[in-house]
A protein has these predicted regions:
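Electropositive polyanion-binding surfaces
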Residues: 2, 70, 177-178, 182, ...
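Charge-lined substrate channels and their catalytic hotspots, especially those that engage the 3′ end
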Residues: 2-286, 293-339, 370, 377-380, ...
């Protein structure tokens, strides 16, 4: 049959179509040139440009009036829609499904958007992606699946990748399936360019997607956590670790009562402590920290390794150290009955716990005891057996003085407004094969809190000393809540029945929050209030610029006490050695402090993500054997898509709103999910049944019983 010649030809490019496209592009360039010529930024011009130039090159009046062009970062959802974050805009721009132009989570995109008033009178924004400026994600991890309508052909089938990350709603087609089976978990390189088709090239096959090993390896790869060191790095560490320990030129504290207290399984012992009571009731607290910078010279392989890794990472079954084990568990670790190089903060405290004076000295110690938290707690609460009492008999008088000082510091910190927002921590118990057989809530006693208080005191003293001496430092900072988040939190607290009239909605103090938490504890509502308080606050980070630490209520604070496992502490040690002790010019280390702060902040986020995901993996594996069981749980979070519920074993999971039965709506203002008959709130106790344990995504699904 003869085709109608008047119809468009989609099969090949015609000369006329080519001319039209060239004309359209020419008009676009001329318009941008004209706008730049009159001082308008073509990146922020408030009209449609490319897609809204019609066949005659005209732009509608509505577009010129209402629509804005801007560039931002795209965040996608599993449902296909997304949001774009713009600088200067309080709220993200909504991008409906079908208007993302193939953008993937993390891409930098050019969008056109408009603002409108919803039926409720709220001003909202909506837009569409017109161009992907740069690709944020280079690879994707997922499970290989096959359908006749998707992916690379093999025996009549086509293969595609179902991403582990639910935010990637487009399933990329595999360009090759050699050595790959359906059900394998792989990492693949994304092939971009076609906005309506996403492809990927296999890079690594981790194994069967339901296996623990495959998921573990995939998480490490996705978060960029490297397990092994190179031969050169190991050799350099071994060389420096072999250096003999000599007391010359250092404060010799080997005759003092100095010891460590740490977890039973810890091998990287950063810190040791000592305490003396002075005349007039004052205290001399010694916090002796492994002198790691001595073993990690500037510009060495190890120095670059520390900058790249940024932190040790603590998984359920292993520790991935920042430095090779010959240092982290060997030469630097303050093992008992071994001479060790340390950097000692000798701090004089008043009888009320106020810092009166602080000295920082290179030193040599010989720890007399390898203390364990559980054993020291047993001594404190009177349950220690004869074996424990015999082990600690030489230091029990010192421990009693230390506990007295800890209680003084605790009272001082509370009065200052330091916030205690402890979330439940899990202790996952593994059998000989590395399989979890039980999960319990980790308890913190006075021994853990004592060490924490002493380390906090040392960190504050060191930061203050460096600041007062105008010496660079890698500060630990925590900004106060932003006014909009603070206002939302105070509204929630007010609706819960708390008096918030004494707190400004523009700015609050740590004491304000501490007062609210105290009131919540009296009412038995500390969990929901703590959760919403955490949501209102920014995350702590590192900075070369001094800023307050809101959560601790301190004006000067740094991390000094864990240089084996944290770059921030190692950098601060190096600056102390080079500038404070050796007298080098402070400005020589200002840029180093900035680089270290940025690298440490990035590494911390990476490590926290990996630790959380590995922990969730083990929790899901453990709970796979308990599907169908019922648990008493606490509503730990409320969102538009359901309730998060946490049983006593901390294995948190979602009850989808669609499975609650009846017609429920999410009340964002009061953080509740309600129907006409029922209301679910943060902190409610509910009975749940485990319905699903998804090892691929590391998630649990419950239902209300």
């Amino acid at each position: 049959m003869k085709r109608n010649s008047s119809k468009k030809s989609f099969g090949k490019r015609t000369e006329g179509n080519t001319h039209k496209r060239k004309s359209k592009e020419l008009r676009r360039r001329e318009l941008l040139k004209m706008l730049d010529g009159i001082g308008q930024s073509s990146d922020n011009v408030k009209i449609k440009i490319s897609d809204d130039l019609g066949r005659r090159g005209r732009t509608s009046q509505k577009a010129r009036r209402d629509e804005i062009s801007a560039e931002g970062v795209f965040s996608s959802s599993k449902s296909g829609f997304g949001f774009v974050t713009l600088e200067g805009e309080e709220r993200d721009i909504f991008i409906p499904e079908g208007k993302t132009r193939g953008a993937v989570d993390g891409d930098r995109v050019l969008i056109i958007y408009h603002k409108y008033e919803s039926f409720s009178g709220e001003i909202k924004t909506e837009g569409r992606v017109v161009e992907i400026v740069s690709y944020g994600r280079k690879t994707v991890i997922g499970t290989v699946e096959a359908e006749r309508s998707f992916g690379h052909r093999k025996g009549g089938k086509r293969f595609f990748l179902v991403p582990d990350d639910a935010k990637i709603s487009i399933y990329p087609e595999l360009t090759s399936v050699e050595g790959i089976r359906v059900g394998d978990k792989i990492e693949a390189k994304l092939i971009r360019g076609n906005p309506y088709k996403l492809e990927c090239e296999p890079l690594v096959n981790f194994g069967r997607t339901e296996s623990r090993e495959a998921n573990y390896s995939a998480i490490l790869s996705d978060t960029g956590i490297e397990i092994d060191f190179t031969k050169e790095e190991e050799a350099e560490a071994a060389f420096f670790a072999s250096r003999p320990v000599e007391a010359a030129g250092r404060l010799d504290l080997r005759g003092e009562t100095v010891f460590t207290i740490d977890g039973e399984g810890a091998k990287d012992l950063d810190d040791a402590i000592s305490l003396k009571r002075l005349r007039g009731g004052a205290y001399e607290l010694g916090v002796h920290i492994a002198d790691v910078s001595y073993y990690v010279p500037e510009r060495s392989h190890l120095d670059r390794v520390a900058m790249a890794r940024g932190t040790s990472v603590y998984f359920t079954d292993k520790v991935v150290p920042m430095l090779p084990k010959s240092l982290s568990n060997g030469a630097c670790s303050l093992n008992a009955d071994e001479d060790k190089y340390t950097l000692s903060a000798i701090i004089k405290l008043s009888r009320n716990g106020e810092i009166l004076e602080a000295k920082i000295e290179p030193s040599v110690i010989r720890s007399s005891l390898r203390g364990v938290y559980s054993e020291v707690n047993a001594i404190f609460d009177g349950t220690a057996d004869e074996k424990i009492l015999e082990k600690y008999k030489a230091v029990i008088p010192t421990l009693e003085k230390m506990r007295s000082l800890y209680l003084i510091l605790k009272d001082k910190n509370e009065k200052r407004g330091a916030l205690e927002l402890d979330s439940p921590e899990a202790e996952i118990l593994l059998d000989g094969a590395g399989v979890p057989y039980d999960i319990i809530k980790r308890e913190r006693g006075d021994a853990e809190k004592l060490i924490e208080a002493f380390m906090l005191t040392a960190n504050e003293a060191v930061a203050t000393k460096l600041y007062d001496a105008k010496i660079p430092c890698v500060y630990r900072i925590h900004e106060p809540p932003a006014p909009d988040k603070l206002s939302d939190f105070l509204s929630y607290a007010h609706n819960m029945g708390f008096d918030t009239s004494y707190i400004s909605r523009e700015k609050c103090s740590p004491q304000d929050f501490a007062r609210l938490l105290s009131a919540a504890e009296e009412k038995g509502l500390s969990l929901p209030l703590s959760y919403t308080m955490l949501r209102s606050m920014s995350k702590a980070k590192y900075s070369a610029e001094r800023m307050d630490h809101f959560g601790l209520g301190l004006t000067k604070y740094c991390h000094f006490t864990s240089p084996i496992r944290r770059l921030s502490d190692l950098a601060t040690h190096r600056i102390i050695h080079k500038v404070l002790l050796e007298g080098k010019r402070p400005e020589l280390y200002a840029s180093y402090a900035k680089r270290a702060a940025a690298a440490a902040s990035e590494a911390e986020l990476r490590a926290l993500s990996a630790e959380r995901r590995i922990e969730n993996l083990y929790k899901v594996i453990y709970m796979q054997g308990r599907i169908g069981e019922e648990f008493s749980a606490t509503v730990s979070s409320v969102s538009s898509f359901g309730l998060f519920c946490m049983p006593e074993n901390t294995c948190e999971g979602l009850v989808p709103i669609s499975e609650l039965g009846g017609s429920f709506i999410f009340d964002e203002k009061n953080l509740t999910i309600r129907s006409r008959e029922l209301v679910y709130r943060l902190g409610d106790t509910v009975r749940v049944r485990l319905e699903e344990a998804d090892i691929i995504r590391g998630k649990l699904r419950y239902s209300i019983v």
